Design a protein with these regions (language model features):
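Bacterial Sec-dependent N-terminal signal peptides
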Residues: 1-25
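Carbohydrate-active catalytic/glycan-binding domains of CAZyme proteins
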Residues: 20-310
Length: 310
């Protein structure tokens, strides 16, 4: 009887050890960032609760491509094989593409790659590429804003500030689809973020870049590449840009750059129709400029902190 009792305890102990070893690793939110004038490189913020953010000191990727060698609007996503892909704006004007690099630990990065995006040589700019992994078609979708003078009704905007959204796709960052028009909402538009809520249920957060609006709106679609519904009324005040969306609990947080006030704003929503301003409930370090939020393991954060301390 005693022997059986010891056997039972041993089995119970091993079961507990096995359960502990297979429990999921703790996750954190990480926010890609840059500081003006955007020539230093990639920075990170991190958060445990999605509300309160701390910086991880240091530069983790210095820009080395493009006419101006900038790193603005860093957008990141994790794809198959636990590989993180980063895209960014390389110049204010003059480049016909955007930057790309990949990493498994957010510290050691591949050689930087200029992805050619626009074939029309009159294109003024390629701004704010946003990367999204489409798990249905198993491909990456990159959306950005460009001005092509004379191509669209400019309204009150100048030809060099009359943006529309374009996109391309890739599975391997070696072969790319042709560039296509992503969205022409009838006004100058930049800073588009795709959010998947459910199968055949996608949300697009975008910036109406016309004067005096300069604010954020919403559109809906059954596909990540549209077609999209007519853009909603604005859900932020004027001079808002660079949105990023993350899910905290059962609600979505939309962080955005209130660039005239030089602070970060945040909205909370469960349906992308009704919004609650939670700007006073969140904390963002000074100097942070807009990137994107994703979730990473505790070991990734630990590695970044260790690298920062060197």
């Amino acid at each position: 009887m005693k022997h059986r009792h010891l056997q039972f305890i041993a089995v119970l102990f091993l079961t507990m050890i096995s359960a502990c070893s297979t429990s999921p690793e703790k996750e954190y939110y990480i926010f890609t960032s840059f500081h003006e004038p955007a020539n230093e490189g990639l920075r990170y913020l991190y958060s445990e609760d999605g509300y309160h953010w701390d910086s991880i000191p240091g530069i983790f990727l210095k820009p080395a491509i493009g006419k101006q060698q900038l790193m603005r609007d860093p957008s990141i996503v994790k794809g198959p094989g636990d590989i993180y892909h980063l895209v960014w704006t390389t110049s204010w004007k003059g480049d016909l593409g955007f930057g790309h690099a990949q990493s498994k630990d957010l510290i050691n990065w591949s050689e930087q790659q200029m992805i050619h995006a626009m074939s029309d040589t009159t294109t003024v700019n390629v701004w704010a590429p946003e990367i999204f992994y489409d798990d249905v078609d198993e491909q990456y979708i990159i959306v950005w804003a460009s001005c092509v003078p004379g191509k669209f009704d400019r309204g009150i905007e100048d030809e060099d500030n009359n943006h529309r959204l374009y996109y391309l796709t890739t599975r391997d960052f070696e072969t790319f689809s042709e560039t296509k028009l992503f969205l022409d909402p009838g006004f100058s538009v930049i800073d588009a973020v795709i959010v998947k809520r459910n199968p055949e249920d996608y949300v697009l957060v975008l910036k109406d870049n016309t004067r005096p609006n300069r604010n954020l709106k919403i559109a809906f679609s059954q596909s990540p590449v549209g077609s999209f519904s007519e853009a909603s009324e604005a859900f932020t005040g004027e001079f808002s840009e660079g949105p990023t969306v993350t899910k905290v609990g059962e609600e979505y947080f939309i962080y955005y750059d209130m660039y005239r006030e030089k602070i970060y704003g945040a909205m909370k929503t469960s349906d992308f129709i009704n919004f609650e301003d939670i700007t006073n409930e969140v904390s963002i370090p000074n100097g942070h400029k807009h990137g994107t939020i994703t979730r990473v393991s505790a070991s990734i954060i630990e590695g970044l902190k260790n690298q920062s301390a060197k």
